[in-house]
Amino acid sequence: MTATTRPLRSVLYIPGSKPRALDKARGLACDAVIFDLEDAVSPEEKVAARETLAEALATGGYGARMRVVRINGLDTEWGVNDARAAAAMKPDAILLPKVGSPADLEALTEIVGDIPLWAMMETPGAMLNAAAIA
């Protein structure tokens, strides 16, 4: 942990496609909110969810809560556009699912610049690469 990193006691996932949930998240007692554009959003809602989330984050009101945007994998039809949109939202971090190697994070960094990244390692192969990914 760096001097600027604080431990997170509670992190809540909120679907990026649900305006009511995005509004409710402004008052939740948690340290961080992960705004999910991946698993919590059906394929037919993904583009609209990206726009809904952008509006919610532009409106603000999340206080000191860490704001993390979970995008779709870069190997999906939504991933690259999610990454570009997430970078424009200026979150505290972007969460990339299904990271298998450092190359996945390097590809995302090419798109989002210096925004901090969170890596979800979800496969045995990723676990074997954990030291390199970290």
Feature map (PLM): residue ranges:
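Conserved alpha/beta-domain cores
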Residues: 2-134
